[in-house]
A protein has these predicted regions:
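Helix-to-loop junction immediately C-terminal to a conserved catalytic motif
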Residues: 49
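Conserved ABC ATPase "signature" region
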Residues: 98, 113-131, 156
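Catalytic Walker B motif of ABC-type/P-loop ATPase nucleotide-binding domains
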Residues: 160-164
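Conserved structural motif at the start of ABC-family nucleotide-binding domains
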Residues: 3, 18-20
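The feature captures the beta-strand-to-loop junction immediately N-terminal to the Walker
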Residues: 34-36
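Conserved ABC transporter NBD signature motif
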Residues: 57-65, 74
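Conserved ABC ATPase signature
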Residues: 135-139, 143
Length: 254
């Protein structure tokens, strides 16, 4: 397994945000995390990425205890595309992408030919040439999200985490970038974990699902194991109509 969480909990001022979360995630799978607002999804993501280390229980990423792993070492294993971006300096797109290579270089050493090659290839693949003279600060929210998707690929980690990372994207770029991530799962056997609010978008790309409500995991498994009326009603407190094709859910409607 790539990721293991054992009885993970997290509280703020006595209020439980996560309660005894236990998960085992495998290599080469696309996981969709679903749940209502305030369920604890982003908190779980922050713990997985080592951003929040004030939790109870244990988290292992590729066999390494997250609490005992340095941020630099962890950033060679897992990359993250957040929902919100805070850039207060006029970096160019290439400069932001080059930050994705930082975990791979030694302190006070220059970037290598490979570093520049990786950045150039992804820069061109994403069509960023038109932003050559534009700072990332000047870009729209959706354009910035595309830059950080690209940075996650530049980082070349076996695990990629997306925390509502398509929230500012139109439908074209949402599906284009999620297709890129799906290809990473299929061709490079990477593990992608993505928080979704749109169930139908998740259906298009995910192999497995994690349902979270009130800080607890209410269901895990593949589509057949999770996407049923009972699980969805318990997750969102409402009824759904599930449209199937060839015994597979293709659309879920209220």
């Amino acid at each position: 397994m790539v990721i293991e969480m054992r009885n993970v909990g997290y509280s703020i001022n006595g209020h439980e945000i996560l309660k005894n979360i236990s998960l085992c995630l495998q290599r080469g799978r696309f996981y969709g995390v679903l749940g209502p607002n305030g369920a604890g999804k982003s908190t779980m993501i922050d713990i997985l990425c080592g951003i929040n280390r004030h939790y109870s229980g244990e988290v292992f990423i590729e066999g390494k205890d997250v609490k005992l792993t340095t941020p630099r070492e962890l950033s060679r294993i897992i990359s993250m595309v957040p929902q919100n971006f805070y850039i207060n300096f006029p970096f160019s797109v290439k400069e932001v992408l080059m930050m994705g290579r930082h975990p791979h270089k030694k302190t006070f050493t220059p970037y290598t030919h490979k570093d520049y090659e990786v950045v150039e290839n992804i820069y061109n693949a994403f069509g960023f040439e038109k932003f050559e003279k534009t700072s990332v600060m000047e870009m729209s929210g959706g354009e910035k999200q595309r830059v950080f998707f690209a940075k996650a690929l530049v980082q070349e980690t076996p695990i990629i985490v997306l925390d509502e990372a398509t929230s500012n994207l139109d439908i074209y770029y949402t599906h284009k970038l999620l297709s890129v991530m799906k290809q990473q799962v299929l061709s490079a056997k990477k593990t992608v974990i993505s928080v979704f609010h749109d169930i139908n978008t998740a259906l298009c790309y995910c192999d497995d699902f994690i349902f979270i409500k009130d800080g607890t995991v209410t269901a895990t498994g593949n589509m057949e194991q999770t996407m049923n009326k009972e699980n969805l009603r318990g997750l969102y407190n409402m009824d759904f109509k599930i449209i199937t094709q060839n015994h597979r859910a293709v659309s879920i409607l209220p």
